[in-house]
Amino acid sequence: MANEANPCPCDIGHKLEYGGMGHEVQVEHIKAYVTRSPVDAGKAVIVVQDIFGWQLPNTRYMADMIARNGYTTIVPDFFVGQEPWDPAGDWSTFPAWLKSRNARKVNREVDAVLRYLRQQCHAQKIGIVGFCWGGVVVHQVMTAYPDIRAGVSVYGIIRDSEDVYNLKNPTLFIFAENDTVIPLEQVSTLTQKLKEHCIVNYQVKTFSGQTHGFVHRKREDCSPADKPYIEEARRNLIEWLNKYV
């Protein structure tokens, strides 16, 4: 993802070689990757892609990790058939590319996914998790959908306007200290404004020494020094879902 005022490169990081536990389905007008929980507890989590798309193995790995913790997970194609960002692409064209993939205009897709989860997966309790571009989607959804019980926004760009602080349900925000995409000043502003305006539970957590994408685009076995932070962030994500979904 990139700063809204000045879009800039987002490194794809370590792309995992991962096949996945789930399968692809058609959900009304969009495709999606679905993984059923080994235990059907009536709980589901929507997992929202970053700019590299719904088929990125890293995102599917995260969805499967969540599924192993008792949730049916779904990774919808929120780009609705449009191409994801190509890591080898010309970054000068990124602002135009991003404009046609507005993370705050996804209600039609969210509504379709909610219908699918309730009708086909018998989900009664639903949460949402998103990374980078998907973190913005989570923030938007948590201000608009009171029936989504919990959200985790992982390094999503922050827009400073009154409506983004009116969260409907508990939301966890995860950031990286050395994120060149999201300045710490933005994180501080978010923290202060939530303190002033938000009436539901929330947490803003910044991980020391980490960079943009560390939770889902770093291989912990290749970065031993980062492994504790990656594991802690993933554990926090699951704990938040367990507590509020």
UniProtKB/Swiss-Prot annotation:
It comes from the Eukaryota. The active site is at C132, D179, H212. GO terms for cellular component: cytosol. Its EC number is 3.1.-.-. The modification Phosphoserine is found at S223. Keywords: Acetylation, Cytoplasm, Hydrolase, Phosphoprotein. The keyword Acetylation applies. It is found in: Cytoplasm, Cytosol. The keyword Cell inner membrane does not apply. One of its GO terms (molecular function) is hydrolase activity. Its main location: cytoplasm. Gene3D superfamilies: alpha/beta hydrolase. InterPro entries: AB_hydrolase_fold (IPR029058), CMBL (IPR042946), Dienelactn_hydro (IPR002925). The modification N-acetylalanine is found at A2. Belongs to the dienelactone hydrolase family. Cysteine hydrolase. PANTHER family: CARBOXYMETHYLENEBUTENOLIDASE HOMOLOG. This is Carboxymethylenebutenolidase homolog.
